[in-house]
Each structure stands twice: as C-alpha cells, then as structure tokens.
Amino acid sequence: MSGPPSGPATIGIAGCGTMGLPMAECLLAAGVDVWGHDVRKVDEFGAFAPRMIADAGDFAARCDIVLSVVRDLRQTEDLCFGDQGILRRDGRPDLFVTCSTLSPRAVADLAARMPDGVDFADAPMSGAPYRAARGTLTFMVGGAEATVGRLMPLFQIMGDGIHHLGPVGSGMTCKVLNNFVGVVGVVAVRKALASAQALGLDRRRLLDVMAMSSGATWYGDNIDAIDWSRQGYDPGNTIGIIEKDVKAYLDALDGGGGVFETALLDELRTLEPLDLEPGPQS
C-alpha cells in the first residue's frame, strides 16, 4: 500500500460489495478522488455514502477510470452495455478495468467491444475482504504497458502484490488457474475437518498442524480471517461464487474438464455450514 497517484484522474468503483467497498475506502484514505456506484441504495454504505452515485449516467460522466467489481458476467454486461450502460453513453470513462472473476473468453469479448476511445484492462484480485480493507490484495493484470502504467499507482494503494502478466486476458487466465487451486483447497480442508470430527480428532489441532506442514493452504491458514469460511453452499453466497470460478476455468479450456473437475463441483455443492469455534487470535 502506497500514497496517492500523481495524476488528477477521477476513479470509479462499480460494485461496492464486500470487495469493492473496502477497495474504494482504501483509495479515499490515500487521497484519491474516488466515487462508488452500486444497485443498492446509497444510504446502505455508511461513511462512504457521500461518495456513492446512484445514477449510472452521472457515475459514468464523472469518472475517468472505472474499476468494475461486480459479481459476474451478467452484471458486467448490464453495467457496460445494458440498463446501466456506462460505456454506451456520451459521457463515459476512458479506461474500463474488470476486476471481477470472469472467464478469459469473456474478457476477450469485452475487450473487442470497447467503444472508440475507451481503453481496457483485466485486473482480478485475490485476498478476501480482510486484505482489501488492509490494502494488501494481490492483483493479476492483463493489458498494454501504457494502460497498466496508468493504473499501477492505484493498484499499489490497494495491494502489495501487483503482477502484470502480459496482454489483455493474461490477468484473468492467471486468476482462474489460481482460483481453481484455491477451490481445491477449500473442499479439501472442509473434508479433512469433517473427517477429523468423525475420527475424534480436535479440528483446531489439525488446523495448527496443517499450517506448518504439507497440508498448508490459504483457506486453512486464514479460516478465521476469511468472512465466508464457514458458509455452506448456496448459489447466492461466496461459496456459490467460487463454483462460478471453477466454471470460468473450464470455459478457458473450452469446457475440457474431466472427472476431477466434475467431482470437485459435486463436492463443493455438498458443503454444509461449518460449525467451528473461533481461534484464539480471531
């Protein structure tokens, strides 16, 4: 996390949910002229409410750069070209960045449809809301050198691991591969915890041992910090969203998954809410 960018650009965060809102708050705290937009009512955003713009046209006209942190491709389409349509207006940003996890194929399609005068980059992030609030996200970025250079001061405020991986689509390709491994970790840890309970082993002791052994995973190591770590599967929650991430990975392979990927999705959908007492530092 570093100081504000030197340029005068006005930044918009579209989709001020569990990731987008703390990202916007980090930028504001660093002195960035940042505004938010969301389909929810402005008064739901607490101290950030004065920086929220409810009307999509007003939001598009105010912002030079828009970072999209909406849930999925359907919401991205609506934001860009649908009812909200910030990119089909005369007053619109000159740089649009998708930070949502989409498929690389969807990113290529979005890039091809950018209006004249609108640059594009993909910059999905990893780290969960607690790291978004700390400004320590990891960004995986795809785009032209000049475009990414313009964005880099913003990423350095919101993150401490910024990786420019190549042209448009490279960031998303890395993200879906990373998330595929992450989902494997979620399912494996939850299965191990269920087995430990069935076998009479203290689950906290198991987590402690795995954290310093070959069973270490991002999910297991951060289970008390991750806000969704105890969720059961529901299409509307974060566990449901990571099902979409596996499907984005499969889409990148032209649907070429096999038995393992099918079993992973099946196991993910069976996850029940986790009843685990908080750890000593949580």
What role is predicted for each listed range?
Residues 218-278:
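Interdomain hinge/lid region at the active-site interface
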Residues 31, 49, 63, 93, ...:
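Short, well-ordered alpha-helix to beta-strand connector turns
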